[in-house]
């Protein structure tokens, strides 16, 4: 590819008989997943330092052949000349089968989900920084979630920092 463009492809396979959860948390053992990421970074704009556009996606199925997950994610991160940034994220997750959260009581179908998020971050090269964001997300079992969050970080030197974060969510599907 060319400068400012990267492409990644990954394939994962976990057998049903091999249990490697002792190495750390894994979502599931019987899994076949294909994932890809395409990132384009551009610079040289008069009003911004850089813009990074990111497209990612994955599809996965379990050993029984059920489609257990997938999604496409679009992210655009714009870094301004003063090093503050705006990030926009949107995603889509199609209907899938969930055979883990029923705790052995069968397989059920989850709904398709969409999400939209917008975040702002002040420049991180100063002692006092702040950021915040807002998002709207559809829940896996129905209903919507609105989430608002942010925070302030004080970093007077490289050896000390203090952080205050807040988060508020309103869930309609729970």
Residue ranges and their predicted role:
Residues 1-174:
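Exposed, low-structure sequence patches enriched in small/polar residues
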């Amino acid at each position: 590819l060319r400068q400012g463009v990267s492409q990644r492809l990954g394939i994962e396979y976990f057998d049903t008989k091999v249990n490697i959860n002792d190495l750390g948390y894994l979502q599931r053992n019987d899994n076949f997943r294909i994932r890809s990421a395409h990132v384009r970074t551009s610079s040289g704009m008069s009003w911004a330092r850089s813009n990074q556009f990111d497209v990612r996606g994955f599809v996965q199925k379990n050993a029984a052949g059920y489609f257990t997950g997938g999604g496409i994610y679009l992210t655009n991160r714009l870094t301004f000349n003063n090093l503050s940034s705006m990030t926009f994220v949107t995603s889509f997750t199609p209907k899938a089968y969930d055979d883990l959260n029923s705790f052995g009581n069968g397989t059920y179908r989850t709904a398709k989900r969409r999400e939209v998020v917008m975040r702002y971050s002040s420049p991180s090269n100063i002692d006092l920084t702040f950021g915040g964001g807002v998002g709207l997300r559809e829940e896996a079992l129905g209903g919507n979630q609105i989430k608002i969050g942010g925070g302030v970080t004080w970093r007077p030197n490289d050896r000390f920092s203090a952080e205050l974060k807040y988060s508020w969510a309103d869930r309609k599907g729970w």
